[in-house]
């Protein structure tokens, strides 16, 4: 048997751990909706033909498997959503597409998600987001408020409330 090893690094950020803790304490109320997106632009052209880069194996289904973008970066978005909410995805409806001509596996994908406890979500993953570097973002909304975390600003956690002003926390510098 083959072994698949995957490091889920985004769940180690202090702001992500804070988001998870606040949801576990019920601060957002009953969760309703999750939006998680992972946007990269490095495969917006067929650079795998140039050689000497990671695109070669990532876009070759014989070497990477049949799941392109959704398997490469969508898995990180999926994990982040389940980690922070503490809920498992029970159902999904996905749409995968290879936009770059001649690419044999998906370079873009989206999925509607149904989590436990009747929470719904949307996951998008793309490697054809021209101009993007490595941008993962999650927003989670409950009946009392919502939160947002972006990997491009990893120490910042934004909390939005129904009945009070938005809070912007600088978590990486507050004793974590």
Located regions from the model:
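Predominantly a Rossmann-like dinucleotide-binding segment in NAD(P)-dependent oxidoreductases
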Residues: 2-5, 10-103, 157
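Beta-strand scaffold of nucleotide-dependent catalytic cores
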Residues: 31-34, 122-126, 149-150
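Beta-strand secondary-structure signal
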Residues: 35, 110-112, 120-124, 137-139
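Glycine-rich phosphate/pyrophosphate-binding beta-alpha loops
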Residues: 75, 101, 124-132
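Substrate-positioning beta->alpha
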Residues: 76, 103-110, 115
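C-terminal glycine/acidic-rich active-site capping loop/insertion
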Residues: 83, 91, 110, 115, ...
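Glycine/proline-rich active-site loop of Rossmann-fold NAD(P)-dependent oxidoreductases
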Residues: 87-88, 103-105, 119, 132-136, ...
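Glycine-rich Rossmann NAD(P)(H)-binding loop
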Residues: 97, 124-128, 141-144
């Amino acid at each position: 048997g083959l072994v698949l090893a995957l490091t889920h690094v985004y769940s180690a950020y202090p702001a992500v751990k804070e988001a998870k803790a606040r949801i576990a304490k019920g601060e957002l109320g009953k969760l309703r909706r999750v939006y998680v997106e992972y946007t990269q632009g490095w495969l917006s052209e067929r650079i795998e033909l140039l050689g000497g880069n990671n695109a070669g194996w990532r876009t070759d289904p014989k070497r990477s498997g049949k799941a392109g973008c959704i398997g490469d970066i969508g898995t990180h978005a999926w994990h982040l959503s389940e980690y922070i909410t503490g809920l498992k995805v029970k159902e999904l409806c996905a749409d995968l597409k290879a936009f770059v001509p001649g690419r044999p596996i998906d370079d873009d994908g989206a999925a509607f998600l149904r989590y436990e406890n009747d929470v719904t979500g949307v996951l998008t993953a793309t490697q054809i987001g021209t101009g993007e570097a490595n941008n993962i973002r999650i927003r989670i909304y409950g009946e009392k408020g919502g939160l947002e975390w972006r990997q491009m600003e990893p120490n910042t956690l934004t909390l939005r409330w129904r009945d009070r002003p938005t809070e912007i926390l600088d978590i990486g510098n507050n004793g974590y």
